[in-house]
Amino acid sequence: MDMFADNVVTLVDEEGREISFEMLDRVNYNGNDYIVLLPLEEMEKEDEEAEVVILRIEDRDGEEVYVGVEDEEELENVFEIFQSRFDDEDFDMYDDDEE
């Protein structure tokens, strides 16, 4: 069994495109769980900071649902927890406002 495949999450964006991510971490902050994802296309880039995506995990009828986080402070705090676990890696946080 390929362990890498176990860490791949495929999500569908607003335009119906499937995007695959590697799940890097699961973080608990203020009683909420978050998932930290790295787009697989980011993994192919070299000599650049990889931009991660952070989503809040919500339970809906017993299923995990990933929800975007609007609050910048919440995002930054979750990112800091994640970053402290991966001190030797160079990650940046994806920001929708940069597009």
Curated annotation (Swiss-Prot):
This is UPF0473 protein Athe_1150. It holds the Pfam family DUF1292. It comes from Caldicellulosiruptor bescii (strain ATCC BAA-1888 / DSM 6725 / KCTC 15123 / Z-1320). It comes from the Bacteria. InterPro entries: UPF0473 (IPR009711). Belongs to the UPF0473 family.
